[in-house]
Amino acid sequence: MAAEEGQVIGCHTVEAWNEQLQKGNDTKGLIVVDFTASWCGPCRFIAPFLAELAKKLPNVTFLKVDVDELKTVAHEWAVESMPTFMFLKEGKIMDKVVGAKKDELQQTIAKHMATAST
């Protein structure tokens, strides 16, 4: 079972990750995945900003994956540094932002929301 963290859904097991990914794919909406780590300073810096975005954008699915907790998932998605944000639609990677870059994160979400099927 995934824990709700504001509107950012923390995936703490591979099962929860797969379940949330499937739910997001079923909605055909934008999924933003935050690959993070508890020891990562920039990750802690960007987390409140991500939570704010999640509150403002209820039609976007925000997921959070701790790379140390779900090493296999991080490896499958070729995550090399944190934070890494993946933008998915219907199971496909549409974009990626590496680093705690608020502006780039916001712009990338806006860009993909504009192309989202309604």
UniProtKB/Swiss-Prot annotation:
Covalent S-S links between cysteines: 40-43
UniProt keyword list: Cytoplasm, Disulfide bond, Electron transport, Redox-active center, Transport
Highest taxon of the lineage: Eukaryota
Pfam name, any one: Thioredoxin
Residues of the active site: 40, 43
GO cellular component, one term: cytoplasm
Residues with site note (Deprotonates C-terminal active site Cys): 34
PROSITE patterns for the chain: THIOREDOXIN_1 (PS00194), THIOREDOXIN_2 (PS51352)
Subcellular location: Cytoplasm
Residue ranges of every copy of the Thioredoxin domain listed in the record: 2-114
Chain positions of site Contributes to redox potential value: 41-42
Xref: SUPFAM superfamilies: Thioredoxin-like (SSF52833)
Keyword match Disulfide bond: yes
Predominant localisation class: cytoplasm
Ranges in a coiled coil: none
Annotated function: Participates in various redox reactions through the reversible oxidation of the active center dithiol to a disulfide. The H form is known to activate a number of cytosolic enzymes.
Family listed: Belongs to the thioredoxin family. Plant H-type subfamily.
Identification of the protein by name: Thioredoxin H-type
Organism this protein belongs to: Ricinus communis
